[in-house]
């Protein structure tokens, strides 16, 4: 049963009438450009064919009812007429409440809604299940009540909800690619202007995501420390963000910086340059150059930004040994576990899957999860 059929059926059972709309918003994988988003830099993600799906209908009162199919059909209910506060027990509900509250704060006028939510974006894997949920909820209200919001505004609203209501300092990339993704393309995003450029993906190349299944948490983790270190670096250069610092400026005074901060800054500056170059390599179908840039990105995350773990490095090495210079592989996401992403010619996928199955668990004691994805369309009706 598809997520659409599942949520429509649950909706009718739970609420006693049929849903009027079904909305989807995809998860994402970032091909290159890690931790650059909150430094006003560049990222190159693509939306993937794993998504959050919401069957919904408008109500004629001011009540919001939300059922989470993936959490034993837990039900959250709140009113649009009283201040929206955090749910004491259901963390999933806070993503919904946060999005609704921030849409209100943006002076959008809308009525009540019934929703049933289900998704297949793996959670805790760094594939943006939370951003996909935020964008899906924002798109539901935009569609049901014809709100004057474009994809970028729905994305910004989701980011605000996660930063201020849920309490995680995420950048804008995850929500933006979920809202604006384009089938068969990656999206080069300028995280300062929010300008996007669709970059066509080479034919015959699979986007493979392998979850290390080494558990990670983002809220309250090292993520926020890295962000502070980057802000310290920007202050040292008296710039609003590291986006405004050149490699030459950095090299001239790197020795004056705290050594740890210097490493963090170097990662961001070199990663930005790699990301812009990667977009052209991808567009030209130059998988060899793309692979080199992904390898440099991984080394920089491992040695300068220090966000990889041995399990992730092992996975990258196993894949690299199979694909050589025919594709690319690196850690993706916030770090400290999660997933690696690989761009691999389709004919090499079985060999990669076999090598990983034979070696990863033997070396780490953890069984991986293997996903072959297609670059997919952003949020909308399904």
UniProtKB/Swiss-Prot annotation:
Binding-site residues, ATP: 124-130
Single Gene Ontology BP annotation: galactose metabolic process
Listed EC numbers: 2.7.1.6
Residues of the site described as Transition state stabilizer: 28
Annotated Gene Ontology cellular component terms: cytosol
Molecular-function GO term, any one: magnesium ion binding
Binding residues annotated for substrate, in chain numbering: 34-37, 223
Catalytic residues identified in the record: 174
Top-rank EC class of the record's enzyme: transferase
Key words of the record: ATP-binding, Carbohydrate metabolism, Cytoplasm, Galactose metabolism, Kinase, Magnesium, Metal-binding, Nucleotide-binding, Transferase
Residues that coordinate or bind Mg(2+): 130, 162
Coiled coil regions in record: none
Pfam families to which the protein is assigned, alphabetical: GalKase_gal_bdg, GHMP_kinases_C, GHMP_kinases_N
Catalytic activity of the protein: alpha-D-galactose + ATP = alpha-D-galactose 1-phosphate + ADP + H(+)
Gene3D superfamilies (alphabetical): 3.30.230.10, GHMP kinase, C-terminal domain
Protein localization: Cytoplasm
Database matches in HAMAP family: Galactokinase
NCBIfam families reported in the protein's UniProt record: gal_kin, PRK05101.1
Family as reported in the entry's similarity comment: Belongs to the GHMP kinase family. GalK subfamily.
Function: Catalyzes the transfer of the gamma-phosphate of ATP to D-galactose to form alpha-D-galactose-1-phosphate (Gal-1-P).
Protein name in UniProt: Galactokinase
Protein species of origin: Escherichia coli O81 (strain ED1a)
Recorded name of the encoding gene: galK
């Amino acid at each position: 049963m598809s997520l659409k059929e599942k949520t429509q059926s649950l909706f009718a059972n739970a609420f006693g009438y049929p849903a009027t709309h079904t909305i989807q918003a995809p998860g994402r994988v970032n091909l290159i450009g890690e931790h650059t988003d909150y430094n006003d830099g560049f990222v190159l993600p693509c939306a993937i064919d794993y998504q959050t799906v919401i069957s919904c209908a408008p109500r004629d009162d001011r009540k919001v009812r939300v059922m989470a199919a993936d959490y034993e059909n837990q039900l959250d209910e709140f009113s649009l007429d009283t201040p929206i506060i955090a749910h004491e027990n259901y963390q999933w509900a806070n993503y919904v409440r946060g999005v609704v509250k921030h849409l209100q704060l943006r002076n959008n006028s809308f009525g009540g809604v019934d929703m049933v939510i289900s998704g297949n974006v793996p959670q805790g894997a760094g594939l943006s299940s939370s951003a996909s949920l935020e964008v899906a909820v924002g798109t539901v209200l935009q569609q049901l009540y014809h709100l004057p919001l474009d994809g970028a505004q729905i994305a910004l609203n989701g980011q605000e909800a996660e930063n201020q209501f849920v309490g995680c300092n995420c950048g804008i990339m995850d929500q933006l690619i979920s809202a604006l993704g384009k089938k068969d393309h990656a999206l080069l995003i300028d995280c300062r202007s929010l300008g996007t450029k669709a970059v066509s993906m080479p034919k015959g190349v699979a986007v493979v995501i392998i979850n290390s299944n080494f558990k990670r948490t983002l809220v309250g983790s090292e993520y926020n420390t890295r962000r502070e270190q980057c802000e310290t670096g920007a202050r040292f250069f008296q710039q609003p963000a590291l986006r405004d610092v050149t490699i030459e400026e950095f090299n001239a005074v790197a020795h004056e910086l705290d050594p740890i901060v210097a490493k963090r800054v170097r990662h961001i500056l070199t990663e930005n340059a790699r990301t812009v170059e990667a977009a052209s390599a991808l567009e030209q179908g130059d998988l060899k150059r793309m692979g080199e840039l992904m390898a440099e990105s991984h080394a920089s995350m491992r040695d300068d930004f220090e966000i990889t773990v041995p399990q992730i490095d092992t996975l990258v090495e196993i894949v690299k040994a199979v694909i050589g210079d025919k594709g690319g592989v690196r850690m993706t996401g916030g770090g400290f576990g999660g997933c690696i992403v690989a761009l691999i010619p389709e004919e090499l996928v079985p060999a990669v899957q076999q090598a990983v199955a034979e070696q990863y668990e033997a070396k780490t004691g953890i069984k991986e999860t293997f996903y072959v994805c297609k670059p997919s369309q952003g949020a909308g009706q399904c």
